[in-house]
């Protein structure tokens, strides 16, 4: 439940622990807000788009008006997805799959910060950090499924934009963001942090330890003499 992200640049002293999850993703649409305070987060594992059928389908159109009707119906389906998100009072959407351009447009108009194509492992950590529930169908989304965070913000890390989900209350998952002057430095820092975390894990699971530096041998020698 500890996510480790690393980015070359700055110094090791710039490394930090985030009480939440850092995503190496940017906001999906340029018209969306880059920061949301008091975030109410919808975690959606399904695509926010019209799913393709498993079999090839053809539509016979005999009247130009039918094209408009077809496109209007498609637009309505996509718009209804956004309305469902709005009705749940979400102001942030974190989606594991793709999001249709039309859905992105309506989400931007509603000032809902959105991130797409998030890794499944990150979705699981987001649920643990925010207390939200991952929903497999947007139509099943309700306010009780939403996760909470003090703020969700897109920040520039060197030449990339990453999204920080921060200020989660009693998070069950957190992020360690490692910085350093070179890739070699941050790789070494990551190994050191991993070793330290494994030591803590072992001590918590089995509160036993053996001191080093020859102390056990010296103690035995004293007793034998």
Predicted regions and their residues:
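Core, soluble structural subunits of large cytosolic macromolecular machines
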Residues: 1-225
